[in-house]
Amino acid sequence: DLANELSRNGRRSGLTFAPEGGSERMRKVINKMVTEEDLIRTVATAYGNGWRQVKLYFMCGLPTETDEDVLQIAELARRVIETGRQVSGTRDIRCTVSIGGFVPKPHTPFQWAAQLDHETTDARLHKLRDAIRADRQYGKSIGFRYHDGKPGTVEGLLSRGDRRVGAVIEQVWRDGSRFDGWS
């Protein structure tokens, strides 16, 4: 059993899972064949074996994504906490939702997909944050981390641009920028 093997040394700090799409519909779009029930069964095993924290990684701005797809992340995190409390017998369960913006990359199935503007990405993430905070029963057990959308726009330009982007990078450097906001 993988959960037992991972915790054999007694350390159970946390496990990370990457459903990536907020809804099953989105996971099908990106060909990530993990159902909600698969994930719930997996976190139940983790919590049942003594783990107290899981992290769920998602992307926002995927092709065909809607606000509702993103808001499904709050419901999934709620189910994770509920399941963890049931199988562990304790309320001391945490789930951190971490979200990065989708950046189309060359030589991938979505290389020609449009990148969502950062204003829309940020608006969706603020709605999600508010939905998590509004959950009186589970919200305090759900952490929420996301990256501002602007650096993702730059990443999209750098990853899909051609040699002409070099002149832009040089000019930005001459103007005094040094990877500001990148870590």
Regions from the PLM with identified roles:
Residues 134-183:
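Radical SAM enzyme core and accessory elements
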Residues 1-94:
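Conserved SAM/AdoMet-binding glycine-rich loop
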